[in-house]
Amino acid sequence: MDKLIKTISVSGAFRAYVLDCTETVRAAQERHHTLSSSTVALGRTLIANQILAANQKGDSKVTVKVIGDSSFGHIISVADTKGHVKGYIQNPGVDIKKTATGEVLVGPFMGQGHFVTITDYGTGNPYTSTTPLITGEIGEDLAYYLTESEQTPSAVGLNVLLDQEDKVKVAGGFMLQVLPEASDEEISRYEKRIQEMPAISSLLASENHIDALLAAIYGKEPYKRLAEEQLSFQCDCSRERFASALMSLPKADLLTMLNEDKGAEIVCQFCGTKYQFDQADLEVLINDKT
């Protein structure tokens, strides 16, 4: 089971989230049939989204849009405070040559663009924030967003490792944030540790990458585990929701589907689930509109 662990230093000056999102990203790959580079780009976005949602309370939802001018197209994901996330990539078929070590490159091919977040607090007035893509690596772009937009200095590491068949082997990451109580001396110690931290791919490849991430973040500094939350890829689409969407169409369009197409098929962008509406279903919808 995927999980996110919330921790805080005993001094109260730093907080860190560490995540195992392997099954979440694996589910996304299976649903969207993504090739290597698209899998990693989408996976990193899902992980980033789960970090942002974990910072919220109540029934809030956070949408992340990675909008670049590359062959990936847009990457969109939505996460809630219950650990659920869904998402898709506009072009699932990007398969860029890997490095000599088998690393899948994303940043150099993301292009120019923006990291957009939309936080819906359930009040009808969502808050939107946009920052430029700094590297296109997603993790560094999230760190820049947190530091610039939320005014919380942050370090973020995210990655998705693939096996020899380009299937998801492990996915996860971390976020470390400086809190107002931090002294200059503490900040210097943590900065040095983050700078000397092994590559995120190496930490994720560890036998127990959650413990490896925590050890890399805190070193010998004492910390407390505050909470452990379960994570999963879960879409909230439904036949009823898409029926309502059809009902919003002009009657003429529904008649065209009925008489010419003999039905309608709707595919959820976020999870790939297909919903069939036959002629009888469309007749009911048309009658309900009159």
UniProtKB/Swiss-Prot annotation:
First and last residue of the signal peptide: none
One Pfam family, short name: HSP33
Keyword tags: Chaperone, Cytoplasm, Disulfide bond, Redox-active center, Stress response, Zinc
Post-translational modifications reported in the UniProt record: Under oxidizing conditions two disulfide bonds are formed involving the reactive cysteines. Under reducing conditions zinc is bound to the reactive cysteines and the protein is inactive.
Domain of life the protein comes from: Bacteria
Statement: the UniProt record of this protein carries the keyword Glycoprotein: no
InterPro entries attached to this UniProt entry: Heat_shock_Hsp33, Heat_shock_Hsp33_C, Heat_shock_Hsp33_N
One GO BP: protein refolding
Function: Redox regulated molecular chaperone. Protects both thermally unfolding and oxidatively damaged proteins from irreversible aggregation. Plays an important role in the bacterial defense system toward oxidative stress.
Family named by the database record: Belongs to the HSP33 family.
Name listed for the protein in its UniProt record: 33 kDa chaperonin
Organism: Streptococcus equi subsp. zooepidemicus (strain MGCS10565)
Lineage: Bacteria, Bacillati, Bacillota, Bacilli, Lactobacillales
